[in-house]
Each structure stands twice: as C-alpha cells, then as structure tokens.
Amino acid sequence: ICIGMQILFEYSEEDNTQCLGLINGGVKKFQSDSNIKVPQMGWNKVISDTDSLNGYYYFANSYYTDSNDYAIGHSYYGKKFNSIVKKDNFLGCQFHPEKSSDIGEKFIKNFINTI
C-alpha cells in the first residue's frame, strides 16, 4: 500500500533511495504545476483490464511509478502512472484501500482471498 508499492521498484527519487528491486523502474516525484498540486490528496480513478479493480480510490502521494509490464491498473494525475502492480506473488497499490470505502474493502478482501 502506497510507499509499500514503491519500495518494490529499484530506486526512489525521494532521498535518492535504493529500493528492493523486485520490479524494474523507479519512483519519481510529481511536479507541481498549474494543473496539479503535490501531494495528490483525494479520490482518483483506477483503470484496469480487470473490471473488479476499476473505480475511484483514495490517494495520498507525492511520488509515482511509470507504467511497465507489471502494471495491472493505472491512473492519471498530470500524467499516466501505475496505481496497481503485480509480479509473481507481489501485489502493490499506490492508493489507500483502507480509506477507499466499499471499493477499498473489496480490494483488500480479494487480495486476502488470493493468498
């Protein structure tokens, strides 16, 4: 969840930190401009080929990961970014399911039922 997803990648721009390296790529900081405020705080849409994942979730993040082969959900906040990644038995989400009402509860239950 949130930074837990980010540490699955190779590195983070936050304090130039090396991460676990389980997923190729890095974590980058959103750049504030007239269209977006950093951090992203609030509801944003997740788009996935898996219908049960589609919907609005609660985000609180200043950093994002680029799309890659392991993205199973993405969102837009000034640019397209990964909102859900899955590799082998690792699953990460950039949003906070615990703050995402019914859809977040469903996400957590589905995750638990897959392990």
State where each predicted segment sits:
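Amide-donor transfer/coupling interface in amidating biosynthetic enzymes
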Residues: G26-I115
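Cysteine-nucleophile active-site neighborhood
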Residues: I1-V38
